[in-house]
Amino acid sequence: MSNRNYIRTERAPKAIGAYSQAVRCGQTVWISGQIPLDPVSMEVIGNSDSDEGVRSQIEQVFANLNCICKDSGGSLREIVKLNIFLTDMSHFHLVNEVMETVFEKPYPSRAAVGVLSLP
């Protein structure tokens, strides 16, 4: 018997592959990775060539996460761990700046990884 509940919200980008936006299993919600897609147009927002553009992309990712959290009955405040993937580690300080506006102390645990590319 499965106690899984598959979460789908129109307020965040739909899945662009063979995965669910999120899955609730018991009291834990597992959220799939997010990229800076506008949920309506399904287009990547912002320009990754400027700090302002990257900041808007980071804000969009957290907005998407917030919608999935809320529509699964939770909030960003309940996030325990974040895995962050960046194609340019020089933008790491922007992640910190945005996180300080999105989360309250104490912050969730976090890993940040530099990668060659993202979808």
Identify the role of each PLM range:
Residues 2-119:
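Short, polar/acidic, helix-capping and beta-turn segments at strand->helix junctions
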